[in-house]
Amino acid sequence: MKRTVIMMLDSFGVGAAGDAAKFGDLGSDTFGHIAKACAEGKADIGREGPLTLPNLARLGLAHAAMESTGAFAPGFADDVELIGAYGHAQELSSGKDTPSGHWEMAGVPVLFDWGYFSEHQNSFPKELTDKILARAGLDGFLGNCHASGTTILEELGEEHMRSGKPIFYTSADSVFQIACHEGTFGLENLYRLCEIAREELEPYNIGRVIARPFDGTGPSDFARTGNRKDYSLEPPAKTVLDKLKAAGGEVVSVGKIADIYAYCGITKKVKANGLEALFDATLDEVKSAGENTIVFTNFVDFDSHYGHRRDVAGYAKGLEYFDSRLPEMLALLDEDDLLILTADHGCDPTWQGTDHTREYVPVLAYGAGLKAGSLGRRNSFADIGQSIASYFKLEPMEYGESFI
């Protein structure tokens, strides 16, 4: 039986990419810097000691990172019995954003330039916001700036609740984000507002509109809920997900995968929030998956909770939890199944600012007759999509080189 499981550790980079300097990210290293902080006792909040990832290490994580950076991360060495094939991949796409990374790993790199709102204050054109407000029947909005999603709630959440005005903000990514309180503004009202924004943003070539619902009574307890929703553009070409679906296969989205691909190539969506629930849902879907199925999970917490918030200890704790669950996944796989662990970009929690970092991503592959050992440096994330196409005997993708 042929099945593929893709476990996408959102933002888990393994060292500055070859073109990182162009992005201001030379020297970034999500995995390496987390390991260093742990080894130095600087990540002992909620956990303690060196970063411990025995199962990821057996799959080749430390070796992939070593080939990327030239040295083993602190606390890791060439002393494990490898069971997986490992490599690291350079992004071909023009950005370091979520859609670009996901689309490229499915065989469709983003070779055009996204639109961005580059001004840190007064970020959005008045013509755009006027159209959104008019269609939504609103008399104003808050924000209009680059911001951290948690900080802006502390600053504007109460005013939003009093006024009913939505909070519009952006970042270095190609994104338009709208934060609204679930109780006072309403979740469905937020979703409708995002749909309007998605339509009005068409001429601006913005990659995503993101609904950022939150709850709480004030700055001390405002918190995002699990009802985030991404409104992405459709990929510019057919991904390997589309091709498997067209061939009669199944593509199961766990978490926000369906949103990122604008539901293209998806046959089933499973909602789950948090590392534990996402892992549980992934296991459940693998247990019931039949022939010619992809189960594709985005573990978003690594990015949203730890990377962007520059929470080194939280990131380390999350990785160790994820690692502790991997034996459950390995036990479910048949000999012919293919397991791939990778990332879509970096988000070094020790780096300046709050944005993504341009990094190589790990490519860890297990099963399907693959021999343990190095896959080397891959020239594109699209090698993953091409390998999946080869595995399922689908029509080859335009980009990427198969390692199967």
Curated annotation (Swiss-Prot):
GO molecular function list: magnesium ion binding; manganese ion binding; phosphopentomutase activity
Major localization listed first in the record, in broad terms: cytoplasm
Reactions catalysed: 2-deoxy-alpha-D-ribose 1-phosphate = 2-deoxy-D-ribose 5-phosphate; alpha-D-ribose 1-phosphate = D-ribose 5-phosphate
Cofactor note: Binds 2 manganese ions.
Localization annotation: Cytoplasm
UniProt-listed Enzyme Commission number(s): 5.4.2.7
Superkingdom of source: Bacteria
InterPro entries: Alkaline_phosphatase_core_sf, DeoB, Metalloenzyme, Phosphopentomutase_DeoB_cap_sf
Residues annotated for Mn(2+) 1 binding in this entry: 10, 344-345
Keywords from the named record: Cytoplasm, Isomerase, Manganese, Metal-binding
Keyword Metal-binding: yes
Pathway: Carbohydrate degradation; 2-deoxy-D-ribose 1-phosphate degradation; D-glyceraldehyde 3-phosphate and acetaldehyde from 2-deoxy-alpha-D-ribose 1-phosphate: step 1/2
Residues that hold Mn(2+) 2 according to the record: 303, 308, 356
One cellular component term from this protein's GO annotations in UniProt: cytosol
GO BP field: 2-deoxyribose 1-phosphate catabolic process; 5-phosphoribose 1-diphosphate biosynthetic process; metabolic compound salvage; nucleotide metabolic process
Cofactor(s) essential for the protein: Mn(2+)
NCBIfam families hit by this protein: deoB, PRK05362.1
Similarity field: Belongs to the phosphopentomutase family.
HAMAP family hit by this protein: Phosphopentomut
Chain's role: Isomerase that catalyzes the conversion of deoxy-ribose 1-phosphate (dRib-1-P) and ribose 1-phosphate (Rib-1-P) to deoxy-ribose 5-phosphate (dRib-5-P) and ribose 5-phosphate (Rib-5-P), respectively.
Protein's name according to its UniProt entry: Phosphopentomutase
Organism of this sequence: Shewanella sp. (strain MR-4)
